[in-house]
């Protein structure tokens, strides 16, 4: 057996190497456990077969309903504000545009933006149509627009040609007569020229007084009386005045009754009497 080396026999270099090796090797000793008691959280143990309570508190349901109602109210207010802003920007009322939409039998529904776009497009079209007509009026050195300005604008502009049936181009009747495009009698020609000079827009024509009436067929054995139509017409225009009776016309004296009775007997004597057996 080898005897252990004595401590004195170790060199200084060997002692230094042993110290270095002891510093390089990690310590495997476990940490010291403190003697103080640390608090442990209490955990409730649940049984695996225990029924779970999934019921929701009624207060939470009411809160959700109130929140949804508030959101709906906010959306309605925003839509109303948008409608008011759109109506302020348009001169045409949106309600009238919706009524025009509903006149179409194939109409079902339209969004608010579609109604607004239709109103805006209508205003822009009317503005363009008026500007084109105003240019033609200024060419004639006039400040007021006339029908011929709109009709000439439709005839001259390709973009407005679709209105040719709605706004047709017209010509004064006097020019047509002078150019012999329209033939009229001399009497009618004078009347038309007078109308052109006075610039009458509308002429009211009275219906004839003696209108033809359909006569219904009479029954067998009946006959129509031959009254003149002129008398009936004059009577309808100028009826005879009605004479009012007075009390003195109704009340008669005794002398008047005697005279009238004598006259009646004389008239009967003069007449021929036919006797029937």
Curated annotation (Swiss-Prot):
The keyword Repeat does not apply. The keyword rRNA-binding does not apply. GO terms for cellular component: CHRAC. Residues 1-91 are annotated as: Disordered. GO terms for biological process: DNA-templated DNA replication. Pfam families: CBFD_NFYB_HMF (PF00808). GO terms for molecular function: protein heterodimerization activity. It comes from the Eukaryota. Its main location: nucleus. It is found in: Nucleus. Residues 1-16, 24-39 have a biased composition (Polar residues). Residues 69-89 have a biased composition (Acidic residues). Keywords: DNA replication, Nucleus. In eukaryotes there are five DNA polymerases: alpha, beta, gamma, delta, and epsilon which are responsible for different reactions of DNA synthesis. As accessory component of the DNA polymerase epsilon (DNA polymerase II) participates in chromosomal DNA replication. Heterotetramer. Consists of four subunits: POL2, DPB2, DPB3 and DPB4. This is DNA polymerase epsilon subunit C. The gene is DPB3.
């Amino acid at each position: 057996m080898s005897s252990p080396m004595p401590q004195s026999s170790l060199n200084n270099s060997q002692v230094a190497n042993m110290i270095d090796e002891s510093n390089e090797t990690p310590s495997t000793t476990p940490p010291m456990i403190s003697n103080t008691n640390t608090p442990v959280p209490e955990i409730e143990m649940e049984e695996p077969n225990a029924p779970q309570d999934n019921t929701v508190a009624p207060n939470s349901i009411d809160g959700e309903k109130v929140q949804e109602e508030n959101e709906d109210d906010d959306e309605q207010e925003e839509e109303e504000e948008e409608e008011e802003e759109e109506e302020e920007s348009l001169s045409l009322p949106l309600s009238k545009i919706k009524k025009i939409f509903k006149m179409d039998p194939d109409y079902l529904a339209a969004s608010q933006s579609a109604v607004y776009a239709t109103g805006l497009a209508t205003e822009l079209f009317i503005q363009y149509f008026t500007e084109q007509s105003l240019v033609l009026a200024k060419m004639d050195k006039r400040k007021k627009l006339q029908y011929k300005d709109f009709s000439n604008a439709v005839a001259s502009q390709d973009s407005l040609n679709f209105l040719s049936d709605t706004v047709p181009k017209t010509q004064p009747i006097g020019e047509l007569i002078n150019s012999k495009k329209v033939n009229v009698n001399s009497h009618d020609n004078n009347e038309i020229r007078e109308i052109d000079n006075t610039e009458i827009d509308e002429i009211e024509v009275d219906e004839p007084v003696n209108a033809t009436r359909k006569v219904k067929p009479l029954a067998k054995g009946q006959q129509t009386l031959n009254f003149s139509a002129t008398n009936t017409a004059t009577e309808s225009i100028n009826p005879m005045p009605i004479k009012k009776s007075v009390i003195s016309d109704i009340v008669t004296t005794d002398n008047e009754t005697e005279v009238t009775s004598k006259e009646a007997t004389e008239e009967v004597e003069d007449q021929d009497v036919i006797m029937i057996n």
